[in-house]
């Protein structure tokens, strides 16, 4: 698990985290998260390896779809885990990956514009 691509966008001041979609039913399993780059980390606790640890926590941007309990926000955007590059003025190159019939991995870059609405993170530019 984890973040496959993390990119800082100077235009918005935020960090974009593209991940492979999760499968755990207790989580919203978004593919894309935006970390609010304008907020300082806050001290808080997490549980890791059955131990409670005090850490600095980052804040997700107040945008995107809300999880059922309202604690997590993100987008269902299947692209970007294999490439996410901020360009300027809200534009990004985002990888569309695929596997060929003979098993080779490929990608095609597409130019997107950041919109950050509740339903759509990006639109093709």
Predicted regions and their residues:
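Beta-propeller domains
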Residues: 77-78, 100
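Short coil/turn segments that connect the beta-strands within blades of beta-propeller domains
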Residues: 11-13, 88-91
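Sequence/structural signature of beta-propeller modules
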Residues: 97-125
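Residue-level signature of beta-propeller blades and closely related beta-rich strand-turn architectures
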Residues: 20-23, 90, 97-100
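Loop/turn-rich, solvent-exposed surfaces of beta-rich toroidal or solenoidal domains
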Residues: 1-74, 80-83
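Conserved catalytic or regulatory cores that recognize and/or transform ribose-phosphate-containing ligands
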Residues: 85, 94-95
């Amino acid at each position: 698990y984890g973040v496959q691509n993390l990119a800082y966008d100077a235009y918005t001041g935020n960090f974009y985290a593209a991940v492979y979609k999760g499968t755990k039913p207790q989580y919203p399993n978004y593919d894309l998260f935006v970390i609010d780059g304008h907020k300082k980390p806050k001290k808080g606790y997490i549980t890791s390896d059955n131990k409670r640890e005090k850490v600095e926590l980052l804040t997700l941007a107040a945008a995107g779809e809300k999880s059922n309990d309202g604690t997590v926000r993100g987008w269902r955007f299947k692209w970007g885990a294999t490439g996410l590059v901020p360009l300027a003025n809200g534009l990004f190159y985002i990888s569309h990956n695929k596997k060929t019939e003979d098993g080779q991995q490929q990608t095609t870059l597409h130019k997107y514009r950041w919109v950050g609405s509740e339903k759509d993170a990006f639109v093709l530019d």
